[in-house]
UniProtKB/Swiss-Prot annotation:
This is Auxin-responsive protein SAUR29. It is found in: Cell membrane. Disruption phenotype: Reduced rosette weight and area at 22 degrees Celsius but not at 28 degrees Celsius. Induction: PIF4-dependent regulation by temperature. In low thermo-responsive cultivars (e.g. Col-0), higher expression at 28 degrees Celsius than at 22 degrees Celsius in petioles but not in leaf blades. In high thermo-responsive cultivars (e.g. cv. Alst-1 and cv. Ang-0) higher expression at 28 degrees Celsius than at 22 degrees Celsius in both petioles and leaf blades. Belongs to the ARG7 family. One of its GO terms (biological process) is auxin-activated signaling pathway. Its main location: membrane. It is a peripheral membrane protein. One of its GO terms (cellular component) is plasma membrane. Keywords: Auxin signaling pathway, Cell membrane, Developmental protein, Growth regulation, Membrane. InterPro entries: SAUR_fam. It comes from the Eukaryota.
Length: 96
């Protein structure tokens, strides 16, 4: 039992989720949270390095988001309206 308490305390100190209780509201330093998907209900949250903002492939996704949503994103964060597999392909190409 002490081992479990120690594990939970360590997770809390490190900022990890204990049984999924942590809210997904912030991104680590140097990263940007984006919501990806075409359906309003099936959006997935992804963390991308802020350096991607300078990449032409990622900028094309941002332009698509601007055309569809302007600056009013329904998820409260940056929403990219494309299939998740397309997003993953783009980000893997940027990674090299």
């Amino acid at each position: 039992m002490a081992l479990v308490r120690g594990f939970m305390a360590a997770k809390k100190i490190l900022g990890g989720s204990v049984a999924g209780t942590r809210k997904e509201t912030s991104a680590p330093k140097g990263f940007l949270a984006v919501y990806v998907g075409e359906s309003q209900r099936k959006k997935q949250r992804h963390l991308v390095p802020v350096s991607y903002l300078n990449q032409p492939l990622f900028q094309a996704l941002l332009i698509k988001a601007e055309e569809e949503f302007g600056f009013n994103h329904p998820m409260g964060g940056l929403t990219i309206p494309c299939p998740e597999d397309t997003f993953l392909t783009v980000t893997s190409q940027i990674q090299g």
